[in-house]
Amino acid sequence: VRNFGFGDLIFRTPKGKELITVSNLPELINAIQTVPEGSLLYHAKSNHFSNWLAAHGYLGLASQVRPLNHADFKNSTAHRAYLVELIENTIKNRKARQVVEIQRDTFDHTKRFTQISGGSLGGKARGLAFAQKMIRLSDFRDRYDGIEINIPHAVVIGTDSFDEFMKQNNLWSDALSKKTNKQISKLFLNSNINEELKNSLKVFVKSVKYPLAVRSSSLLEDSQYQPLSGMYATYMLPNNRKKLKERLEDIIVAIKLVYASTFFQDPKSLISGSVHHIEEEKMAVIIMQMVGQNYNGRYYPPISGTAQSFNFYPVSYMKRNEGVVHLALGLGRTIANGEKSLRFSPKYPGILPQYYSIKAALESSQNSFYAMDLSPKNHPLFNGEEKNLSSYNLEIAETDGSLKWSGSIISKEDNVIRDSLSYDGTRITTFAPILKWGKFPLVDILKDLIIMGKEALGCEVEIEFAVNIFDDPNRKPEFALLQIKPMVMGGSREIINIEEESNNEIFCSSKVTLGDGLIDNVRHIVFVDP
């Protein structure tokens, strides 16, 4: 019965002397790392590890450990390391299964999603938690073995803290009556968060050294009907000041400003035109690891983007239900602000309609990108949300080494687009190494995520993502799913067919147009024949 795995696992010498008792996975890791080689071989050959794991419900791990043979490894050190890696991956995956609350004294880096305070997670954080669960419950990651696919580490401050902040500082009346965003921001910055939240944030800040994005996650944000996506504030923080007190203060200021954005004029106007009331809105806050790399004091990912399952503006033989992707070099603000980015159908990644001529390529290509300035002299919150990031030209990206994943050149010699940076000419972004040469399976990943998202949500979906590709060949490239949310679908979905026979009735036509829609306040159209 002892060898069936019930109860504790007792490590012994081959002669039966007890060495150490194990009751959970962390203790098992410690034992594997410390017991003598003879004991390790004895238990491995006798299948005691897999028996104990299976009896304690770790069936997947047991099935991985069972077929292992010591002869398959170079030495016992390699054997130990492999066993530890398998167990650590199981611990990490189990902890990633749920949103857990932060502990008072420690922050666990193996947990992808942690909550501070109670209440709702808000729309954006709820979508992030859903994305994590969707990835975990599928075999999605197994299809891309050499790529790290996950959501960024995130801490969510539930809406209970927002309620307490508003009540403790008696803010409701003033927040609703102030006329300008500047007045509202000042009101909130002069208010205090409670000590319990401050202490939890202090535990978090002590443990993380990477740049952070402090994002809104209101109740109405990213909902399928009348969403407020993009209406509230997001602040990027280098999180690299020398003093803990300063880093903590930056996060607290960013949280207050996100809270304040609940009452800014744009969201208030949008809510007033809906079935909702501003008094119903509550704000959760996500503090998320920024995805990117440090390029000479600038922090940004080589690729960021969005993917939508429905294409409102198909051209040529593209179809609406084939979706559309927008890609940009650097942080995603380029796309969020509607600036120049690369647009293509995931079904035809090699076809770029916006580059139908050299002139069009020059006019349509992204020519600048956003990054976080990591300089200690830069105060990330001093000039508000819009000045929170810095803009750079493509020559800087080439110097950084990040343009090689997205850049091409319009050759000065023959005025032809070359998928190489070794020619003289104008730099443009085509993402040819990804879309044409398959250096990273981005299109396949996005296709799979769109299918999974539509099945899970039961509607058209929009995905936000970022990609890290490293120069170090031993480091896995990363695909970070930043958000998945219902896509806003308004107006008619009816397909309008124009027959060839009706060409003589067409008074104006174009090969590059917006999709159809409805404008109900236009009564007359005046056409002037050019």
Summary of predicted features, one role per range:
Residues 131-136, 162-168:
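Short active-site loop/helix that positions an aromatic residue
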Residues 171, 175-189:
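N-terminal leader/propeptide and maturation segments of large enzyme subunits in energy/redox metabolism
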